[in-house]
Amino acid sequence: QGYQAGTDSFSDNESAKYAVNLLSDLGTKGYFEPGFASVDFTSACNLFFGGSGAIFYTGSGQISLAEEMYDNGELGFFPVPDTEGMDNMSTNVPVHAGFAEGFNKATYDDTMQEFFDYMCENFTDACYNQAQVFSPFNEELPEGLPQLYYDTQPMFEDAETAWTSWDDKLDSDVMTKIVDEQQKLAQGITTPDEFIKTCDSFVEK
């Protein structure tokens, strides 16, 4: 929000500069797969769960793919690591809450209330038994799920701090430009200093 408002910048934010340099190192020192800039999510899943990738950022929607490998001790999970010398927070796992629902007060009638009640009462069951993802509701996990659900849930229960992703803070034009610059940074086309200068120019102070 500070960046979008022009009150903060990459050049003035130590955490942002650290992240820029980290992305540059990961991209230019061989940590990403060849041709990573053109890889879609399905291809990335196949690479990781096929045993060729080492680290993959994903959500509970892929637990069904990870279940057998996790049970066999072939993969594990870890939260966002702390950074030495930085102001770290105790909440170290991103929790994505899905989509918001909006209702029109003028047309909200008994039928809509019945639907809303039904949705809330059955949403958790649909998450685990149909969509196979974590439910956003703070309810007990049902029995019979893959072990990975039970082992990762404590990280969410202990989360104390919430934050908003860049996708929601920035307008679409600025977000698109930053993503384009990230691609160039990770491929070594631009330097960290060039990235910082360019991205700071996207927002008027």
Model regions and ranges:
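Glycine-centered hinge/linker elements that transmit conformational signals in sensory
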Residues: G6-A37
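C-terminal capping/gating helix-and-loop segments adjacent to ligand/active sites or protein-protein/ligand interfaces
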Residues: N129-P136, E140, Y150-E204
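Beta->alpha turn/N-cap motifs
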Residues: F41, T58-I63
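Alpha-to-beta junction loops
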Residues: G50-G59, G73
